[in-house]
């Protein structure tokens, strides 16, 4: 289960839960922790790709006029 469902305060920004999970995935990945690389370098290598896509889809759904009726994806 995603961590943003656990008792956390909502910061009021769109897709904030996915943003937190994406950030946590990058910062806890072996690429950053053990190898000492920057998170941006790990993204280029393809780590946490599913979280990146989910966050992108959530942000993109904010621009979709149909989502006003359906709600944002990922929330």
Swiss-Prot record:
Disulfide bonds join 31-58, 42-48. A motif (Cx9C motif) lies at residues 48-58. One of its GO terms (cellular component) is mitochondrion. InterPro entries: Cyt_c_oxidase_assmbl_Pet191 (IPR018793). This is Cytochrome c oxidase assembly factor 5. Residues 28-66 form the CHCH domain. Involved in an early step of the mitochondrial complex IV assembly process. It comes from Danio rerio. A motif (Cx10C motif) lies at residues 31-42. One of its GO terms (biological process) is mitochondrial cytochrome c oxidase assembly. It comes from the Eukaryota.
């Amino acid at each position: 289960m995603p961590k943003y469902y656990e008792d956390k305060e909502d910061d009021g920004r769109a897709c904030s839960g996915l943003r937190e999970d994406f950030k946590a995935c990058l910062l806890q990945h072996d690429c950053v922790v053990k190898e000492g690389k920057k998170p941006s370098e790990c993204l280029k290598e393809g780590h946490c790709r599913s979280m990146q896509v989910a966050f992108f889809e959530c942000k993109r759904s904010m621009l979709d006029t149909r989502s006003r009726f359906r709600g944002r994806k990922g929330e």
